[in-house]
């Protein structure tokens, strides 16, 4: 936030993959925890879960945790949790994990594919993991509508509240 206020750009040379053959080699990547402005996922997401799922799920859980804290809803009673749910999605989801496990399958065979392959890439895992972490027992919804996923998630959550399916809905998207 301080950098936004100071008009400081987060754009830099891509580090997460070899971009040599690409026309564009800059991006606004989320910096690791050891960076001056880095993101420390361990504040909100257990290390075991981080190892099992793609980064979009980790970002989604972290964002949801921050949203619940900011709204004062991170310690709801059981009765409140019965009518609280999630509507969180992703436009593409776990492509990095799908790519890496496809290479494992092709080069090393099926016995070497991670047992977390499927459940670590599914778009509904953000809502699922958030519901598990916070004990949310209301609607659990995952949207996949490309670039409009976050907006659709918010709209669907609003409709669920309007239709009295829930009192509280956590909504958004992660990529």
Predicted segments — roles?
Residues 150:
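Short conserved active-site loop signatures built around small residues
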Residues 90-92, 147, 175:
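Short, flexible active-site-adjacent loop segments at beta-strand->alpha-helix junctions, enriched
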Residues 15, 167-175:
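Acyl-CoA/ACP chain-elongation machinery
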Residues 153:
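Active-site histidine-anchored catalytic micro-motif
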Residues 156:
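Internal active-site segments that recognize and position negatively charged phosphoryl groups
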Residues 139-145:
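Short loop-beta-helix segment that forms the pyridoxal 5′-phosphate
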Residues 1-92, 97-138, 159-162:
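Conserved "HGTGT" condensation-loop signature of ketosynthase/thiolase-family condensing enzymes
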